[in-house]
Amino acid sequence: FNNAQGMRTSREIIETAFSDIISPRDVWSVTVCAYRGDSIRESFSKMTSKRLGYMEDTYEFFVIANESQTLQNYADFRALKYRIGAGRSGRRLYSAEEFSKRQREVHEMYLLLCEYCNSQRDDTDFYSRTSLWMKRQYLLMLVTDWVTRLPAADQDKGYTAIVETWGAADAAIMLFDPLIARGESLLSKNSIPPGNDEFYRWGQILAKIVPMVDDGRNLPRYDQYRQLEQALEHHVAEIQLKEQQALQAEQERIEAQARFKKGTLMRRVIDKVMPAGSLNRDLVSVIRSHAQRAKRER
């Protein structure tokens, strides 16, 4: 965190942590900052009195950043060591029920964040854009948890909870990131993925959601996914064709080798019984010649 970015003031503070306007972006971690007493008490007085759940620090730091007037970055400052992303839950796997509960908590917190943004009377367009940006971040974090922390057997059930909580459109949009990334990864490999690969499993989940959203016509990146799906089908077909051709070539090689070995043995027998130049050998040659001529004349 020890980035020497100098002083941030007013609107810059929230833009630094909650937008892509200023780079590099600051993290929204309440625990890596020191606060002036009056300022932080004033910020907390503007927050909801409701109990927050999973990822609650995003809401807290959003309000703090918006209410603050100055943010000073200090380089080479050593204090509490905090591991971003390990939080209260660590990195263990979730059950479908636990994931469902946590994603509901995030959605409830997002609604509270929107409520706070709507209470800001100046520059409503800015707060509308910022809350929408936060929504995308929440969806991205949730789908990352869904991919990495839910067993494959629970992912279908977990995504049903997302659809019920966030709606079909948002649920479909958040699925495109891992789905397209997985498809592009498969497309770069010279191998045929198994039928239960994540790309196919996640695609089946998406197929259930798309009919709820006007058949996907209004979904960003849906066309990109469909093109990728077709490209992967073509890619797999090409690999299968090459494998079949290689198998056929190998079979022909084995058969030719067998014929060669058989022919070699027969030639040895003929050479032994009817040596070259012998009357019997010449007689056989004449008979074969007449037989071939008769065959051509028919």
Give the label of every model feature segment.
Residues W28, Y127-S128:
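Short, basic/polar, glycine-containing "phosphate-handling" surface segments that engage DNA
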